[in-house]
């Protein structure tokens, strides 16, 4: 109302109101709400505890005091007596319980214990991680039925002496060569230092008369021709690589010898490759 009157301009005197009281002999129709008395009012004894009057006598009369030092124990004084300062003595070692005593003498032993616990934990975590990784890797390996199909059994009595027979193994050509005595002596007499990929003949065979190779040229993956080439072994028609009867590179662009797969003689005339 006052703000409206202040902004009304020339109508402000009309909008303002004045109240006056005139004394008279007539008695009031209503009694006074608070009778006049000379006795002091009685305060309610059940007043709220958390009020300004109740807290004024319990508040701290002095500021909070804290004492901290290098050779003295830390202490804090509060206004309330029911507050318990946390005590971590049960978690501390006996050598460092006394704050007024130097703990330098026991520092090496405490460090050694910490290092021992850390190293033990690290080894345990590494072992657990190794097992987890091993199980994960083994889950991606081939199953037993797939591994069974990856092996091939060859009857050696079907291959005459001096001949080479090709088989299909894991989608690749597999050469099994029955060498003659002349071929065995010839390949054993080759000087290893003259070879591009130095390897003695006895390192590539388990039985001198049998040579088992993967028929894939190590240059660009072509299939060599058996009993051909300048050295009577294998010849790659793609780029002219020559291999001897032991599958070693002797001439041409191929950088390595023919690969020797994993095989095992189960009997005198049966070999299992894979």
From Swiss-Prot:
Q: How does it sit in the membrane?
A: Single-pass membrane protein
One Gene Ontology term of the biological-process aspect is:
respiratory electron transport chain
Q: Where are the transmembrane segments?
A: 104-140
* Claim: Ion transport is one of the keywords in the record: no
Traced from the root, the source organism's taxonomic lineage reads:
Eukaryota, Metazoa, Chordata, Craniata, Vertebrata
Which locations, inside or outside the cell, does it occupy?
Mitochondrion inner membrane
Which keywords does this Swiss-Prot/TrEMBL entry list?
Answer: 2Fe-2S, Disulfide bond, Electron transport, Iron, Iron-sulfur, Membrane, Metal-binding, Mitochondrion, Mitochondrion inner membrane, Respiratory chain, Transit peptide, Translocase, Transmembrane, Transmembrane helix, Transport
Name of the protein described by the UniProt record: Cytochrome b-c1 complex subunit Rieske, mitochondrial
